[in-house]
Amino acid sequence: MNKTLLCLVTSFAIAPALSHADSPYFSLKDGDGFKRFSVSVGALHVMPQGKAQPIQINSAIKNGDVAQNGTIKVDTVLENLDPNLNQDALAATLKFLGFFTGGDLPSGISGSSKIQGLESWEAKNTGLEADDVTTFGIMTNYFFTDNISFEIKAGIPPKVDILGKGKISAPFAAIATPQIGNLPLDFLEIGLKNDIPIADLDAHGKAAEARAWTPAFEFQYHFGKTGVNKFRPYVGIGLMYAYFNDLEMNPALEKDLITAGHMIANIKQGNAGAALEKTESTANPVVELEASDAFAPVATVGFTYDFNDRWFAVGSVSYAHLKGETTITVKDAQLGELVQAKSDIEINPILGYAGVGYRF
């Protein structure tokens, strides 16, 4: 954004010098039968066309990491047994043992688990999409000739709703090895496997919101001739810059992500059983949300209709091939990064504009 402002300031600074140059294209004076400048204001409606892209997730638990289980409920173990393995006899043994331990497996018996699946995964059928939004648009033009102009598209940066799609689950798998004291009971290995629910993005509706700054710059060709044709179609091509700030996450989704942070923290702290039970750890997970800047080509078709030599109506439809990236990080001051999720947001907006302008 700073570079963009610098370019604009520089352009205004050299404009007086250009106006004195002997050139029919760069001048502050009227051209041959046409006005050099125009500005219009009106309604700008943005309709994103992109589809949700799968969210990519990483955690601090690497494949093959071994963690102590700590105290865990027998029912928790039974609910997470690998359904692809025949462990009926083991399940009966666990139930029998739980009868004498009040339903818990204490840390001296639960042993440890070798964990798989949480290092990285793709949450299929999930993603983020930008919602439609309407704002106040401002279009300014400088005409090199009666037919060729340079336009700056701007407006009041709107708050855009980011919609969540799908359900996120963690593909947890592990081999648990019970122990007596410090003696591992390798012959009693327990296969665990389950998709642990993390967040239902559909239930939250709006996952987040952000303020979108999307100035665009175009070279345009206007058909017809000033003073002859009241109705003048035009086409344009240029570049859009997208910058997002004031990002705010849905509190319910943030709570789900903090819970996921506690799960990873529990594993790192030697309480893998508490992770399966979604018990709070001693960590203090916080959630950070970021969105990357992006550039995109933009193309426009539109028209102007002259009321007189100064006032006119304008309408246009533009398309920008715009894609950004959103990063969600869950971290703790002591344990560092616990979970990171990245998602491409295909915005690809169609922009409809209708306004009234003035030439000078």
Put a short name on every predicted segment.
Residues 19-109:
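Outer-membrane beta-barrel biogenesis signature
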